[in-house]
Amino acid sequence: VGDVGSRRVGNFERSYEVFAGVVPPRIRNQSTPGADEAQRDLLEIACRHHGIGTAADLADYFRIGITEARPRLAELLEAGRLQMAVVDGWSDVAYLHPEAVRPRSVAARALLSPFDPVVWFRPRAERLFGFRYRIEIYVPELKREYGYYVLPFLLGDRLVGRVDLKADRANGRLLARGVFAEEGVDTGGVAFELSIELDRLADFLGLGEVVVGSRGNLAGPLRSVRR
Protein backbone atom coordinates (compact mmCIF):
# COMPACT_ATOMS: atom_id res chain seq x y z
CA VAL A 1 0.00 0.00 0.00
CA GLY A 2 1.39 3.37 -1.00
CA ASP A 3 1.42 6.69 0.84
CA VAL A 4 -0.42 8.72 -1.81
CA GLY A 5 -3.87 8.14 -3.30
CA SER A 6 -5.87 9.81 -6.05
CA ARG A 7 -9.52 10.56 -6.61
CA ARG A 8 -11.50 11.90 -9.55
CA VAL A 9 -12.72 15.45 -8.96
CA GLY A 10 -14.16 16.28 -12.38
CA ASN A 11 -14.07 15.34 -16.03
CA PHE A 12 -10.61 13.94 -16.71
CA GLU A 13 -9.26 15.53 -13.52
CA ARG A 14 -7.70 13.86 -10.50
CA SER A 15 -6.53 15.12 -7.14
CA TYR A 16 -3.68 13.51 -5.24
CA GLU A 17 -3.56 13.43 -1.47
CA VAL A 18 -2.47 11.37 1.51
CA PHE A 19 -3.73 7.80 1.11
CA ALA A 20 -5.67 7.92 4.39
CA GLY A 21 -7.75 10.78 3.02
CA VAL A 22 -8.80 8.80 -0.03
CA VAL A 23 -9.53 5.31 1.30
CA PRO A 24 -11.85 4.93 4.33
CA PRO A 25 -10.61 3.06 7.43
CA ARG A 26 -12.94 0.08 6.88
CA ILE A 27 -11.05 -0.60 3.64
CA ARG A 28 -7.64 0.64 4.69
CA ASN A 29 -7.49 -1.55 7.78
CA GLN A 30 -8.26 -4.79 5.98
CA SER A 31 -5.45 -7.20 5.25
CA THR A 32 -4.21 -7.14 1.67
CA PRO A 33 -5.64 -10.17 -0.16
CA GLY A 34 -3.49 -12.54 -2.16
CA ALA A 35 -3.86 -12.71 -5.92
CA ASP A 36 -6.18 -15.73 -5.93
CA GLU A 37 -8.47 -14.28 -3.26
CA ALA A 38 -8.61 -10.94 -5.05
CA GLN A 39 -9.53 -12.63 -8.32
CA ARG A 40 -12.26 -14.66 -6.63
CA ASP A 41 -13.74 -11.51 -5.11
CA LEU A 42 -13.61 -9.65 -8.42
CA LEU A 43 -15.21 -12.51 -10.33
CA GLU A 44 -18.00 -12.75 -7.76
CA ILE A 45 -18.61 -9.00 -8.08
CA ALA A 46 -18.67 -9.37 -11.87
CA CYS A 47 -21.26 -12.15 -11.62
CA ARG A 48 -23.36 -10.13 -9.18
CA HIS A 49 -23.40 -7.23 -11.63
CA HIS A 50 -24.15 -9.45 -14.63
CA GLY A 51 -26.56 -11.76 -12.85
CA ILE A 52 -25.44 -14.53 -15.17
CA GLY A 53 -22.52 -14.88 -17.54
CA THR A 54 -19.98 -17.15 -19.14
CA ALA A 55 -16.42 -17.45 -17.90
CA ALA A 56 -15.34 -15.05 -20.66
CA ASP A 57 -18.04 -12.52 -19.70
CA LEU A 58 -17.00 -12.47 -16.05
CA ALA A 59 -13.27 -12.48 -16.73
CA ASP A 60 -13.53 -9.52 -19.09
CA TYR A 61 -15.38 -7.37 -16.55
CA PHE A 62 -12.21 -6.74 -14.54
CA ARG A 63 -9.78 -7.74 -17.31
CA ILE A 64 -8.73 -11.02 -15.71
CA GLY A 65 -7.11 -13.51 -18.07
CA ILE A 66 -9.44 -16.38 -18.91
CA THR A 67 -6.84 -19.01 -17.96
CA GLU A 68 -6.57 -17.39 -14.52
CA ALA A 69 -10.32 -16.97 -14.18
CA ARG A 70 -11.38 -20.57 -14.79
CA PRO A 71 -9.80 -22.10 -11.65
CA ARG A 72 -11.06 -19.19 -9.53
CA LEU A 73 -14.58 -19.75 -10.87
CA ALA A 74 -14.32 -23.44 -10.00
CA GLU A 75 -13.36 -22.45 -6.46
CA LEU A 76 -16.33 -20.07 -6.24
CA LEU A 77 -18.64 -22.89 -7.34
CA GLU A 78 -17.20 -25.23 -4.75
CA ALA A 79 -17.66 -22.60 -2.04
CA GLY A 80 -21.27 -22.00 -3.07
CA ARG A 81 -20.61 -18.38 -3.95
CA LEU A 82 -21.69 -19.01 -7.55
CA GLN A 83 -23.93 -21.57 -9.22
CA MET A 84 -23.60 -23.36 -12.55
CA ALA A 85 -26.32 -22.72 -15.13
CA VAL A 86 -27.20 -23.65 -18.70
CA VAL A 87 -28.73 -21.07 -21.04
CA ASP A 88 -30.54 -22.12 -24.21
CA GLY A 89 -28.56 -21.03 -27.25
CA TRP A 90 -25.27 -20.53 -25.40
CA SER A 91 -22.44 -22.87 -26.35
CA ASP A 92 -20.60 -22.29 -23.06
CA VAL A 93 -21.80 -23.06 -19.55
CA ALA A 94 -22.84 -20.07 -17.47
CA TYR A 95 -22.33 -18.92 -13.90
CA LEU A 96 -25.28 -17.60 -11.91
CA HIS A 97 -25.03 -15.41 -8.84
CA PRO A 98 -27.20 -16.80 -5.99
CA GLU A 99 -28.75 -13.36 -5.39
CA ALA A 100 -29.60 -12.75 -9.05
CA VAL A 101 -33.23 -11.70 -9.57
CA ARG A 102 -34.92 -11.63 -12.95
CA PRO A 103 -37.13 -8.53 -13.20
CA ARG A 104 -40.67 -8.99 -14.48
CA SER A 105 -40.20 -6.06 -16.82
CA VAL A 106 -37.50 -3.58 -17.78
CA ALA A 107 -38.53 0.04 -18.36
CA ALA A 108 -35.27 1.36 -19.78
CA ARG A 109 -34.58 3.94 -22.47
CA ALA A 110 -31.05 5.14 -23.06
CA LEU A 111 -28.44 5.98 -25.64
CA LEU A 112 -25.42 3.96 -24.56
CA SER A 113 -21.80 4.97 -24.64
CA PRO A 114 -19.58 2.60 -26.66
CA PHE A 115 -17.90 1.89 -23.32
CA ASP A 116 -21.08 1.02 -21.41
CA PRO A 117 -20.89 -2.43 -19.78
CA VAL A 118 -23.99 -3.50 -21.72
CA VAL A 119 -22.05 -3.42 -25.00
CA TRP A 120 -18.40 -3.21 -23.98
CA PHE A 121 -17.77 -6.96 -24.23
CA ARG A 122 -18.92 -7.44 -27.81
CA PRO A 123 -19.39 -11.25 -27.72
CA ARG A 124 -21.82 -10.92 -24.80
CA ALA A 125 -23.83 -8.14 -26.48
CA GLU A 126 -24.10 -10.23 -29.62
CA ARG A 127 -25.08 -13.35 -27.68
CA LEU A 128 -27.67 -11.63 -25.49
CA PHE A 129 -29.19 -9.16 -27.93
CA GLY A 130 -28.17 -10.35 -31.39
CA PHE A 131 -26.51 -6.94 -31.65
CA ARG A 132 -23.23 -6.80 -33.55
CA TYR A 133 -21.45 -3.60 -32.56
CA ARG A 134 -18.07 -2.17 -33.49
CA ILE A 135 -16.51 1.25 -32.93
CA GLU A 136 -15.70 2.66 -36.36
CA ILE A 137 -13.74 5.79 -35.47
CA TYR A 138 -10.55 4.19 -36.83
CA VAL A 139 -12.25 2.77 -39.93
CA PRO A 140 -11.78 4.79 -43.16
CA GLU A 141 -14.94 6.78 -43.84
CA LEU A 142 -15.89 4.93 -47.03
CA LYS A 143 -15.62 1.58 -45.25
CA ARG A 144 -17.78 2.45 -42.24
CA GLU A 145 -21.02 0.52 -41.95
CA TYR A 146 -22.92 2.93 -39.67
CA GLY A 147 -20.80 5.99 -38.95
CA TYR A 148 -17.98 7.62 -37.03
CA TYR A 149 -19.36 7.63 -33.48
CA VAL A 150 -22.43 5.43 -33.18
CA LEU A 151 -24.41 5.00 -29.95
CA PRO A 152 -26.60 1.92 -29.38
CA PHE A 153 -30.20 2.62 -28.35
CA LEU A 154 -31.55 0.54 -25.46
CA LEU A 155 -35.31 0.31 -25.13
CA GLY A 156 -36.80 -1.98 -22.51
CA ASP A 157 -34.67 -5.11 -22.47
CA ARG A 158 -33.58 -4.89 -26.12
CA LEU A 159 -31.04 -3.03 -28.19
CA VAL A 160 -33.35 -1.75 -30.90
CA GLY A 161 -31.23 0.66 -32.91
CA ARG A 162 -28.16 2.85 -33.23
CA VAL A 163 -27.47 6.49 -34.04
CA ASP A 164 -24.44 8.21 -35.54
CA LEU A 165 -24.33 11.42 -33.51
CA LYS A 166 -22.31 14.61 -33.69
CA ALA A 167 -22.54 17.72 -31.53
CA ASP A 168 -22.39 20.79 -33.78
CA ARG A 169 -21.62 23.20 -30.96
CA ALA A 170 -20.87 26.14 -33.24
CA ASN A 171 -24.49 26.11 -34.44
CA GLY A 172 -26.12 24.70 -31.30
CA ARG A 173 -27.30 21.51 -33.00
CA LEU A 174 -27.25 17.79 -32.24
CA LEU A 175 -26.84 16.00 -35.57
CA ALA A 176 -28.29 12.51 -35.97
CA ARG A 177 -26.36 11.82 -39.15
CA GLY A 178 -27.43 8.19 -39.44
CA VAL A 179 -30.31 6.42 -37.68
CA PHE A 180 -30.70 2.65 -37.88
CA ALA A 181 -33.30 0.24 -36.50
CA GLU A 182 -32.54 -3.39 -35.76
CA GLU A 183 -34.40 -6.04 -37.71
CA GLY A 184 -37.91 -6.86 -36.52
CA VAL A 185 -38.53 -3.83 -34.30
CA ASP A 186 -41.54 -1.52 -34.40
CA THR A 187 -39.91 1.40 -36.20
CA GLY A 188 -42.70 3.82 -35.32
CA GLY A 189 -42.51 3.05 -31.62
CA VAL A 190 -38.72 3.08 -31.61
CA ALA A 191 -38.65 6.42 -33.46
CA PHE A 192 -41.02 7.97 -30.92
CA GLU A 193 -38.92 6.85 -27.94
CA LEU A 194 -35.64 7.75 -29.63
CA SER A 195 -36.93 11.25 -30.39
CA ILE A 196 -37.52 11.82 -26.68
CA GLU A 197 -34.04 10.57 -25.84
CA LEU A 198 -32.39 12.76 -28.47
CA ASP A 199 -34.14 15.82 -27.02
CA ARG A 200 -32.89 14.87 -23.56
CA LEU A 201 -29.34 14.48 -24.83
CA ALA A 202 -29.44 17.78 -26.70
CA ASP A 203 -30.70 19.52 -23.55
CA PHE A 204 -27.94 17.89 -21.48
CA LEU A 205 -25.32 19.11 -23.98
CA GLY A 206 -26.78 22.61 -24.08
CA LEU A 207 -27.79 22.30 -27.75
CA GLY A 208 -31.02 23.90 -28.90
CA GLU A 209 -31.93 21.77 -31.90
CA VAL A 210 -31.92 18.14 -33.07
CA VAL A 211 -31.33 17.66 -36.80
CA VAL A 212 -32.06 14.25 -38.33
CA GLY A 213 -30.23 13.28 -41.50
CA SER A 214 -31.45 10.99 -44.26
CA ARG A 215 -29.15 8.01 -43.77
CA GLY A 216 -30.47 4.80 -42.25
CA ASN A 217 -33.73 2.85 -42.22
CA LEU A 218 -35.00 4.72 -39.14
CA ALA A 219 -34.29 8.22 -40.44
CA GLY A 220 -37.65 8.56 -42.21
CA PRO A 221 -39.79 7.39 -39.28
CA LEU A 222 -37.79 9.61 -36.90
CA ARG A 223 -38.23 12.70 -39.08
CA SER A 224 -41.96 11.96 -39.32
CA VAL A 225 -42.25 11.77 -35.53
CA ARG A 226 -40.44 15.08 -35.13
CA ARG A 227 -42.58 17.10 -37.57
Locations of regions flagged by a protein language model:
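Long, low-complexity intrinsically disordered regions
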Residues: V1-L111, D116-V119, R124, F131-I135, ...
